[in-house]
């Protein structure tokens, strides 16, 4: 028996063990993923966001978040199609660095985060016991998911 013939079963076993370990890690990571369906904002935060939205965003995006001539809708299929699978930190950054279009960057980060909570409520995501954090790092861990879990 050649050396490669003797080592073949060990190489095969090592490959199986590696694949099993990677599968377990992937399964744990998927199970630990937080999404917008995990009640990531509070009702009072969404209410603050609604007030801020009415004062700062509605003139371009519409009172019902349906969009305007040059501003996209912030609810429904187009919005979810653009943001599905992305972290809320990306949405926060987009708003903070591009809105309002005539005076970019004037919105305080708490206001932006509260408006995101309002947008989540308007898109049918449930409220919870803890506020959506304004810090970027925790928002990187919350993924926008278009479809309600278990509805497929």
What are these regions (language model features)?
Residues 63, 97-98, 121-125:
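Generic structural signal for alpha-helix termini and adjacent loop/cap motifs
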Residues 27-52:
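Electrostatic cytochrome c docking/interface patches
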Residues 1-6:
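N-terminal secretory signal peptides that target proteins for export/translocation
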Residues 40-46, 65-100:
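Gly/Gly-Pro-rich "capping" loops immediately C-terminal to redox-active cysteine motifs
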Residues 34-35, 70-79, 133-137:
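Short linear capping/connector segments at secondary-structure termini
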Residues 10-21:
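Bacterial N-terminal signal peptides
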Residues 34, 104-152:
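Flexible coil segments in periplasmic/lumen-exposed cytochrome c-class electron-transfer proteins
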Residues 49, 53-64, 115, 119:
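The canonical Cys-X-X-Cys-His
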């Amino acid at each position: 028996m050649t050396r490669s013939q003797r080592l073949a079963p060990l190489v095969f076993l090592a490959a199986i063990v590696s694949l099993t370990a990677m599968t377990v890690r992937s399964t744990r990571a998927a199970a630990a993923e937080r999404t917008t369906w995990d009640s990531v904002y509070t009702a009072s935060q969404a209410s603050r966001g609604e007030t801020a939205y009415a004062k700062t965003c509605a003139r371009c995006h519409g009172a019902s978040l349906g969009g305007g001539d040059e501003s996209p809708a912030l609810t429904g299929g187009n919005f979810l199609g653009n943001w599905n699978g992305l972290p809320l930190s990306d949405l926060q950054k987009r708003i903070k660095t591009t809105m309002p279009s005539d005076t970019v960057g004037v919105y305080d980060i708490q206001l932006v985060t509260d408006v995101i909570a309002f947008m989540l409520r308007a898109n049918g995501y449930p409220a919870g016991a803890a506020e959506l954090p304004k810090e970027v790092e925790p928002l990187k861990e919350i993924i926008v998911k278009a479809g309600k879990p278990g509805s497929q």
